[in-house]
Structures are given as structure tokens and as C-alpha cells.
């Protein structure tokens, strides 16, 4: 039972300083709801533990029509980004703004040199054939989507975060994969599975086996 004494719901009509909510996060500040969810989870065995992942692999690969041997599932897109960056050998990672805020954090943790750039700067980059580039396309921050495949041969690794592509797939590369391309997707946005932490990446068999 939840003790409701000294608990008040926030007044959402008032501006609260330093509470930033954007489209790249799935957060809320309703502590009553948080406690209720904890109570439900504590009293049920439903959706508490991860099951065997073979059915999930089959379901994802059948839905997106991609080969299972080139697919890896993970605990959301964040986990997969970290794993991909741990598995590739590059001189530098160019991160196209606006971007997911954890990419540079992982670069620091792993020891990868990185640089933030704008989309219109890519064509002028020189000698980047030993480097990688990271896009969020479509972009959940500014709502833009671009045809980026023309930049693919310029880089050693071409990493595309397509967590929003189920909403707009005109520029998705999931059906135009190449050996240097990595597609990262999440089920948290289109299916609302943020709490379950489910994502997958699609790339070369060598990378997936890493």
C-alpha cells in the first residue's frame, strides 16, 4: 500500500526550472506513478525477466526481412552503440549534430578520438577513409531526415542510428546494407518498449561476430 501522506502531485501548469525534457529521452517526474509501478512489478512475475532471445531474433528478422546472421540484439540502442564502438578500429569518429548525447561519452570511455560536425561539413572532410561517422537519421531532435548514403564510401565505418525510422523510412538504409554500414534500431520509440530495453543492430557478419 502506498502511503499518500506528505505526497503531492507536481503542478504541471507551473514552469519548473532545470527540468529539461526532450525527444531523445523517455522520462517523467511523477513520483507517485513511479511508486505505483514499483508496487505492480514487486507483486507479479510478468515481464520481469528476459526470456530466451531466439524468438526475438526470429521476430525482428522476419519483420524487417534481414538475415539473422547479420543481426545482433541488445539492451536498447545505447547498449548497441557502446558495443559497436568497442568493436571497430578507427582513427576518429565524426559525430553529426544534433546527436544522441551518449556517443561522445562512450568515445571517451573507450579512448576513441571524436569530433562534432554539421551535416554540411561532410563533403569538405579530407583523408577520413580510416575514420567513422555517426548519424541519427531521421533525427529526433530537429525532425529532419536526409539522404546520406552518398557519404558512405568516404568513411571506413558508416554508423546510422535509425531509432526513428519506423515513423519515416524513406531514407532508411536497412535494405541497402554494405560491409562498412551499421544500422542501429530500437523498439522503444515506435512500439513504446523503452522500459524493456530492446534494440538491434544490422551490419556485416564480421562485425556482428565481434
Question: Which residues does each predicted region cover?
Answer:
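Short glycine-rich anion-binding loops that position phosphate/pyrophosphate groups of nucleotides
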Residues: 26-29, 77, 100, 138-141, ...
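Conserved PLP-anchoring active-site segment centered on the Schiff-base-forming lysine
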Residues: 87-108, 113, 120, 126
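Short, conserved active-site loop motifs that form the nucleotide-linked donor/cofactor pocket
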Residues: 71, 156, 181
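Conserved beta-loop-alpha segment that forms the PLP phosphate-binding cup at the N-terminus of a helix
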Residues: 54, 68-93
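Conserved core segment of the aminotransferase class I/II
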Residues: 182-210
